[in-house]
């Protein structure tokens, strides 16, 4: 059974679950040390095209996928043959394989690659070097690698760290700074940022400016600000929402902020498959309220085809506040 993300991870004060945090802290030291050693031992491979890595320093929920989409779109519009590369988390195929939206399902290649493959060439590969080289052989002149900041196997031309810009209500993207499993960090913040070329702060749909204290946390690092925007109106009338992402509560907030008449909302674990019984439960709940069903695009691609007709996907897109800053980074690597 997949477990959901503990919300107490993201409380800046570290006050919730003090006993749990204390008990898990020795495992955090082990995790951080193992990650550091693995990265230090690696010799990154040159794959024949510039690789832009979109990663993060937390366990999930930062918003990498919308940034990957926006980078692929930007590069494609500039005439670059940009391909996406993902590990394919949640899928059974190891790759390298190019995602085929007709032949593959989320159970094969993972939900995020399947979603992105609707618009861009996408590859999944457990071996990122093999996946990148396969993309180059297929004509890629640039590769956008999703979630590879702690993967040292591929030589990166540009490393971008995405950070969740939600800081309201005591929430903080790094929690109290502890490494997994005592906190949300994949590695200590300073260690992760030392390998990055820039930070992207991704703001929720209803936040105007990034928190000043958050910007201070990055020191002298270049920081780009992007914002999530609705790519379509929310469905009309009462809705029962559901989402299985790292931070499902963000979807509930975003739908409400966009004017959706949510009468109920159900969170599920990230990348989890939806069983027929679960979907029937959601449909029954919606029937009680005489409501529709709404979810994210990422969740929608995990639904069986018959259920996709009964659920409305609500798409969001990332938009950079200063496109010129992104352009300067891309020009710096010859793109």
Swiss-Prot record:
Q: Where are the transmembrane segments?
A: none
Catalyzed chemical reaction(s): a lipid A disaccharide + ATP = a lipid IVA + ADP + H(+)
Q: What is its EC number?
A: 2.7.1.130
Residues noted as binding ATP in the record, renumbered to the chain? 58-65
- Top enzyme class: transferase
InterPro entries per the UniProt record, alphabetical: LpxK, P-loop_NTPase
Question: One GO cellular component from the entry?
Answer: plasma membrane
Q: Which GO terms describe its biological process?
A: lipid A biosynthetic process; lipopolysaccharide core region biosynthetic process
The cross-references to Pfam families, in alphabetical order and at most eight, read:
LpxK
For whether the record's keyword set contains tRNA-binding, the answer is no
Q: Does the keyword Ribosomal protein apply?
A: no
Recite the UniProt keywords alphabetically. Answer: ATP-binding, Kinase, Lipid A biosynthesis, Lipid biosynthesis, Lipid metabolism, Nucleotide-binding, Transferase
Q: To which pathway does this protein belong?
A: Glycolipid biosynthesis; lipid IV(A) biosynthesis; lipid IV(A) from (3R)-3-hydroxytetradecanoyl-[acyl-carrier-protein] and UDP-N-acetyl-alpha-D-glucosamine: step 6/6
Cite the GO molecular-function annotations of the record: ATP binding; tetraacyldisaccharide 4'-kinase activity
What NCBIfam families does UniProt report for this protein, alphabetically? lpxK (TIGR00682)
Q: Which family does it belong to?
A: Belongs to the LpxK family.
Q: Which PANTHER family match?
A: TETRAACYLDISACCHARIDE 4'-KINASE, TETRAACYLDISACCHARIDE 4'-KINASE, MITOCHONDRIAL-RELATED
Known function: Transfers the gamma-phosphate of ATP to the 4'-position of a tetraacyldisaccharide 1-phosphate intermediate (termed DS-1-P) to form tetraacyldisaccharide 1,4'-bis-phosphate (lipid IVA).
Q: What is this protein called?
A: Tetraacyldisaccharide 4'-kinase
- Gene from which the chain derives: lpxK
């Amino acid at each position: 059974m997949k477990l959901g993300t503990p919300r107490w991870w993201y409380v800046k004060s570290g006050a919730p679950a003090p006993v749990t945090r204390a008990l898990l802290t020795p495992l955090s030291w082990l995790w951080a040390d193992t990650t550091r050693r693995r990265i230090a031992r690696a010799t990154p491979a040159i794959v024949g095209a510039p690789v832009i890595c979109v990663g993060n320093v937390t366990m999930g929920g930062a918003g990498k996928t919308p940034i990957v989409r926006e980078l692929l779109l930007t590069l494609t519009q500039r005439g670059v043959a940009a391909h996406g590369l993902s590990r394919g988390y949640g899928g059974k195929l190891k790759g390298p394989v190019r995602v085929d939206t007709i032949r593959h399902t989320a159970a094969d290649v993972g939900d995020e690659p399947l979603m992105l493959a609707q618009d861009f060439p996408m590859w999944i590969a457990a071996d990122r070097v093999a996946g990148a080289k396969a993309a180059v052989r297929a004509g890629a002149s640039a590769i956008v690698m999703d979630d590879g900041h702690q993967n040292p196997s591929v030589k990166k031309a540009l490393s971008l760290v995405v950070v969740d810009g939600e800081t309201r209500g005591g929430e903080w993207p790094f929690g109290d700074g502890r490494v997994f499993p005592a906190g949300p960090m994949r590695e200590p913040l300073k260690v992760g940022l030392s390998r990055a070329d820039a930070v992207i702060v991704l703001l929720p749909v209803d936040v105007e400016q990034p928190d000043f204290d958050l910007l201070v946390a990055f020191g002298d690092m270049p920081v780009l600000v992007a914002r999530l925007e609705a790519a379509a109106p929310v469905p009309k009338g009462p809705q029962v929402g559901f989402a299985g992402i790292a931070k499902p509560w963000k979807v509930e907030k975003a739908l409400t902020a966009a004017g959706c008449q949510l009468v109920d909302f159900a969170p599920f674990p990230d990348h989890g498959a939806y069983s027929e019984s679960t979907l029937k439960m959601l449909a029954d709940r919606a029937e009680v309220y005489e409501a529709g069903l709404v979810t994210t695009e990422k969740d929608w691609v995990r639904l069986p085809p018959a259920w996709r007709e009964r659920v409305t996907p609500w798409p969001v897109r990332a938009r950079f506040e200063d496109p010129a800053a992104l352009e300067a980074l891309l020009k710096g690597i010859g793109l």
